[in-house]
Amino acid sequence: MQMFANPEVALAGLPGCTVGIEAEEGLLATLESLAKSIGCVPLPLPAGIRPLYHASAYYVGPFLIALLKEGAKLWAGFGASERQSMAALIPLLRGTVAAVQDAGLAKGMGGCIARGDMGTIQKHLASLEHVDSSAADLYRKLALRNIPLALERGSIDPGRARQIETLLDSTDKPVR
């Protein structure tokens, strides 16, 4: 899978990329061979699954860009330029990817949800509500998705998970 916003960058990034192939048996071997010949990793897909395969790519492609933009907007709130925010956030992104490559999704996750740090979560929510309630809503939705990872990681217990869920599901704005 590869982002094709800039063809030259995409071409340079092709080696090692997974290429989903949905084809009948006779054509499948030819397409797999073609994918391998350009350094890609072929992945045979069951019939009809391509939309789901491509939708999964959106989470770590265009949606990731949307999350970076959300981060840049928050940085703009304290006077930083988009360039400054990206100079700080891209290394964080690289470190996150490296942690996941090293330890897997759950063990590679850090942060306040992974620690079960209710105080920090409350501070995050309060500051986000203060500047942009839609950013706070996005934070809540994404944080809820981190709870099962923290449980799998073993860094929080089910009781703490319920407390975090309650805090995140709260319709009341946190006390500032």
Predicted regions, residues:
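C-terminal active-site/capping subdomain that shapes the small-molecule cofactor and substrate pocket
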Residues: 105-176
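Helical "substrate-binding/catalytic lid" subdomain
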Residues: 42, 48-131, 135
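Aromatic/hydrophobic pocket-lining residues that form π-stacking "cages" and hydrophobic walls in ligand
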Residues: 31, 71, 146
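A general structural signal for short secondary-structure boundary/capping elements
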Residues: 20-22, 65-68, 155-162
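Rossmann-fold dinucleotide-binding core
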Residues: 1-54
